[in-house]
Amino acid sequence: MREKPMEERENGVRTAHLTGALPMSEMLEMYVDVEKFLGYCAACPRCGRMWSCPPYDFDPEEVWLRYAAVTLYAVQVFPESGAAKAAALADPEMFLRPYRRALDTLLEERERETPGSLRLDAGRCLVCERCARRDAQPCRFPEKLRYSLESLGANVGALVADKLGAPLQWGTKDAPPEYFVLVGAVLTKGE
């Protein structure tokens, strides 16, 4: 199920908010391959350096199996002005940070509204400036720590293309993509 996107424009950037839902059985069958996608995580410099990134002391597949349904929440970010494109090209993570924080806030609200649910954020944990895992220390805020779809083995590229109609795009060294997609989810016990 996919809802019609809501669009906004501000400071040379257009955003579209997307939502979709699917049963966990479909998610597991079509979009989760823990071994494959955690293998990609192993190539990332953040792997083993953040508590929101693998390797974990739990089986990610077990997380999925505790829930019955997945609701996706995403924001497409279109840098349209010259200044927005330059900012997106210079430092994509910083350019996207306010959109990421807004999406994480929405996910937090949805999780709070739905007892027994679990939110998956749009990427790595942003709670601490420097993750305690880098210093071989336990997470300082375990109640705030959330994982991402991809860190638990989800194929985010296929998921957003199929369920939200927003295939991932890649920029070049000279130009950002037409749009970025930030996607998170809320896993729920009931269909």
Enumerate the predicted regions with their spans:
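Catalytic cores of enzyme domains
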Residues: 15-191
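Amphipathic alpha-helical segments
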Residues: 9-14
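N-terminal amphipathic/basic-hydrophobic helices that include classical n-h-c signal peptides
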Residues: 1-6
